[in-house]
Amino acid sequence: MVLAASVVQEVANVPFAHEVAGLVQPVAEAQNVLGLIPMSHGLILAGILFAIGLCGVMVRRNFLFMLMSLEIMMNAAALAFVVAGSRWVDPDGQIMFIFILTLAAAEAAIGLAILLRFYHQRGHLDVDSANEMKG
């Protein structure tokens, strides 16, 4: 009976703040690790990658290079989601990355199938000739 009373006394002496600090400490450590790269730098990198991909889509006329530029643009958007999610220690950014990665894989598969069909019909990958009709 004395042992049970001493255990109850020790539990009563532990302040609630120590329990909260034990739960908050891993979150603070995660913020320190993820905070090595500022959010602005990550978003600037994502913006630069998106601009490179956009220039590639607008300038290049080869269908394969246009698909690669589109992939760069999708990866830039995924990077922006991951950076934003890591800023607030929220897994939503990583979940969106998985969705974008899945979408990019489907886009690549369909795009390459269209590319092969286009190449077998035309013999080249110039998209400017796609509006010319056979006749």
UniProtKB/Swiss-Prot annotation:
A GO-annotated cellular component: plasma membrane
GO molecular function annotations of the record: NADH:ubiquinone reductase (non-electrogenic) activity; quinone binding
A family per Pfam: Oxidored_q2
Enzyme Commission identifier(s): 7.1.1.-
Substrates-to-products reaction catalysed: a quinone + NADH + 5 H(+)(in) = a quinol + NAD(+) + 4 H(+)(out)
Keyword Translocase part of the UniProt annotation: yes
Cellular compartment(s): Cell inner membrane
Membrane topology of this protein: Multi-pass membrane protein
Main location: membrane
UniProt keyword annotations, A-Z: Cell inner membrane, Cell membrane, Membrane, NAD, Quinone, Translocase, Transmembrane, Transmembrane helix, Transport, Ubiquinone
GO biological process per UniProt: ATP synthesis coupled electron transport
InterPro entries for this protein: NADH_UbQ_OxRdtase_chain4L/K (IPR001133), NUOK/Mnh_C1-like (IPR039428)
Membrane-spanning intervals of the chain: 33-53, 63-83, 95-115
Its biological purpose: NDH-1 shuttles electrons from NADH, via FMN and iron-sulfur (Fe-S) centers, to quinones in the respiratory chain. The immediate electron acceptor for the enzyme in this species is believed to be ubiquinone. Couples the redox reaction to proton translocation (for every two electrons transferred, four hydrogen ions are translocated across the cytoplasmic membrane), and thus conserves the redox energy in a proton gradient.
Description of how the protein assembles with itself and partners: NDH-1 is composed of 14 different subunits. Subunits NuoA, H, J, K, L, M, N constitute the membrane sector of the complex.
Assigned protein family: Belongs to the complex I subunit 4L family.
PANTHER family cross-referenced by the UniProt entry: NADH-UBIQUINONE OXIDOREDUCTASE CHAIN 4L, NADH-UBIQUINONE OXIDOREDUCTASE SUBUNIT ND4L
The protein's name in its UniProt record: NADH-quinone oxidoreductase subunit K
Species per Swiss-Prot/TrEMBL record: Psychrobacter cryohalolentis (strain ATCC BAA-1226 / DSM 17306 / VKM B-2378 / K5)
Gene: nuoK
